[in-house]
């Protein structure tokens, strides 16, 4: 019986310097980083790319990626990206932020950047918790979600307010050109996310205005589930509030 020929279908992106990182097993953020790096290579923009990184678990990434990175203070990445893109308009600029950084701490920054039609791409890694500081509730935590600060009851609207659907909000802003939402919990979701992220990047490359992609990422540590259970957790808890779709396009 002959042995079937094995084909390599995926390899480490050239822009990824090391596969070692300090994030938890089962975290979805390294998967999102891989998709981003693959696209930067495929679009041949890595040499002129500037990533503006927020504060979160993903702040561990700048040391393992072969692109220029600016480190911003909590929530301020869109303002830093605005300055970088205006001073260096030929550069490809994107922000990398979590929900705590972008939506809880820097909501005004992202809204005003979209309203001005700033010509960079904002990428949100949304896992519904402040992962780096111990798993506290953020503005995107869904109703009923147990976090370090909503452990007994889960998030209750009457006490904690409703989650902010930032992609839906930005889609209503006149200055935004492209807004979409993806996820990292299944192969099909990853393929979808690569597609929409590529479209968002092309919007910037074509000078069409502000582009935004929200990516739902897994956090087994602060969801209190095993890594293998996180895909089902997203379907049960996030899908109703944050459906995967394109909300706005040119």
Give the residues covered by each predicted segment.
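Glycine-rich ThDP/TPP pyrophosphate-binding loop and its adjacent helix/strand module
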Residues: 90, 104-121, 125, 129-250
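A generic structural signal for short
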Residues: 24-25, 69, 97-99, 154-155, ...
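Thiamine diphosphate
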Residues: 1-94, 206
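Short glycine-rich anion-binding loops that position phosphate/pyrophosphate groups of nucleotides
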Residues: 56-58, 100, 218
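Gly/Ser-rich oxyanion-binding loop with an adjacent helix/lid
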Residues: 95-105
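Cofactor-binding loop segments of dinucleotide-utilizing enzymes, especially the Rossmann-like FAD-
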Residues: 54, 98, 125-127
């Amino acid at each position: 019986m002959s042995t079937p020929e094995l084909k390599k279908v995926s390899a480490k992106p050239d822009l990824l310097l090391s596969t070692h990182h300090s994030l938890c097993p089962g975290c979805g953020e390294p998967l999102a980083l891989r998709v981003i790096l693959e696209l930067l290579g495929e679009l041949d923009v890595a040499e002129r790319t500037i990533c503006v990184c927020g504060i979160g678990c993903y702040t561990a990434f700048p040391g393992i990626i072969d692109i220029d990175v600016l480190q911003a203070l909590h929530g301020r990445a869109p303002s830093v990206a605005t300055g970088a893109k205006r001073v260096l308009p030929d550069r490809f600029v994107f922000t990398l932020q979590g929900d705590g950084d972008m939506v809880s701490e820097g909501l005004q920054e992202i809204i005003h950047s979209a309203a001005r039609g700033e010509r960079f791409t904002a990428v949100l890694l949304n896992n519904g918790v402040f992962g780096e500081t111990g798993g506290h509730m953020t503005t995107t935590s869904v109703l009923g979600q147990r976090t370090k600060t909503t452990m007994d009851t889960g998030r209750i609207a009457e006490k904690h307010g409703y989650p902010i659907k930032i992609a839906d909000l930005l889609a209503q802003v006149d200055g935004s050109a492209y807004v979409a939402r993806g996820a990292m919990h299944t192969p099909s979701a990853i393929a979808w996310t690569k597609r929409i992220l590529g479209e968002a990047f092309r919007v910037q490359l074509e000078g069409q205005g502000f582009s935004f992609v929200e990516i739902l990422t897994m956090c087994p540590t602060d969801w209190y589930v095993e890594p293998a259970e996180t895909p089902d957790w997203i379907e049960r808890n996030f899908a109703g509030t944050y459906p995967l779709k394109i909300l706005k396009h040119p």
